[in-house]
Every structure is written in C-alpha cells, then in structure tokens.
A protein has these predicted regions:
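Helix-loop-helix
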Residues: 1-218
Length: 218
C-alpha cells in the first residue's frame, strides 16, 4: 500500500512539475506526461510489438491452411485442436501471445495511477475549448474515437473482409467510454492512441522492409 501511495505521489508531482513549473498547463501537462511514460516503456513495447507484428504476418500467411484444417477437422474439436497445435508448432507459434498481455500489464499501473490522481482532484482547470477537465466533453470524446480508429487502421494485417468493422467498433466503444470519463483522462487516452498508432505504423513498415530485403523470412 505504501508503494502504491509512493507511485501516486510520483505521478502527481511529475504532473505538477509539467503543468505548473514548466508552465504547460494541466492539458499539455497530461499530454507530455503520457508521451514521457510511453517513451519510458518503449524498449519493452517495441520489442513485444515487433514480435507481435511478425506473428500477425505469419498468421495472415497461414489463413489458407487454417481454413483447410477447419474444413477437414472442424467436426472433431479434439482432433482439430491437435492439428492446430501441430501447425503452430511447425511455424514456431503459440496458441496464445503472452507477450502482448505483458505489454498491457506494464501500462496498467500508469493508467490506474493517473486515474486515481485525476479522481483526487488533479484535473482541475481548462484546456483549449474544454472549460472543466473534471467533466466529460463530447468533442474530446470524438477525438478519442478518431485516434482509436487511426490506431486500428495502422495495422495492415487486419482481415480485409472485417477491416472496417475492426476499425469502427473499437472507435465507437472508445467514444462511449470517453463520455463517461473526465476530460483529463480522455486526453491521456487520445495521446496514448497517437503514440501507439505511430509505433504500430513504424513497426509494420520496418518488418515489411526487412522481409522485402530478405533480412527477415516469415
């Protein structure tokens, strides 16, 4: 409990430094804090994201084989699972991507910490058109939805037949969620989405370039 209180105090102090001491204001302070924390996690999230990108491209390449297995063994769940596991093992894949979960877990303390800081009153003030950062804002919620859509669209390996749905649905959920949160936390999500979208785009571009040059075989 003392460790968590120390963590909360650290986030609060850093936000105060950015907003007051550097004169950024609470809105830009939240944006800067988000970019700083995401940058600090970049060595971890980049490594995990790189492996995840390769996994996605392998899964895309395996779609015809996966469909064939489902057609042949779909009526026998046990046999289908065995064949699926065998195919994954041949390709060096696991049924579950634990690394992606690790990246999410690494960011959870930051999200929960910022939520508590804002809940305790560190969200007082205004930013641009937003008069009260302690309350939700429709325009900001739409921006959160837009940045969520950009994040999803940055992944070229989304199934083409479901691409629009996989982009639109998370964006709609993000808008609804942001309308229930204080604007301060919505700024965090918008900034984090922008960072993640840029990282995703760069990762896929890097993998595609390495595959094209022959440095990486998938």
């Amino acid at each position: 409990m003392e460790l968590w209180a120390f963590w909360i105090d650290g986030i609060r102090s850093l936000l105060h430094f950015l907003a007051s001491d550097l004169g950024l204001g609470i809105g830009l302070g939240i944006f800067a804090l988000t970019l700083a924390t995401r940058s600090a996690l970049l060595p971890l999230t980049w490594s995990i994201g790189y492996r995840g990108c390769i996994r996605q491209k392998k899964m895309t390449r395996l779609q015809p084989q996966l469909k064939r297995l489902k057609d042949e063994f779909g009526r026998d769940p046990k046999l289908y699972a065995e064949q699926l596991q065998q195919l994954y093992a041949q390709q060096g894949l696991s049924l579950l991507d634990a690394r992606g979960l690790l990246a999410l877990i690494a960011q959870t303390p930051i999200l929960l910490g910022m939520y508590q800081v804002f809940r305790d009153g560190a969200n007082a003030g205004r930013f641009l058109w937003i008069r009260d950062l302690a309350k939700p804002d429709l325009a900001l919620a739409l921006i959160v939805g837009l940045t969520t859509a950009l994040l999803m669209a940055a992944n070229p390996d989304l199934p083409q037949q479901m691409r629009l749905l996989l982009i639109a649905l998370p964006a709609i959920v993000a808008v609804i969620t942001a309308l229930k949160l204080c604007s301060a936390l919505a700024i965090y999500f918008a900034a984090s989405n922008c960072f993640s979208a840029a990282q995703t785009y760069c990762l896929h571009a890097l993998v595609a370039r390495r595959v094209k040059s022959g440095a990486l075989v998938i």
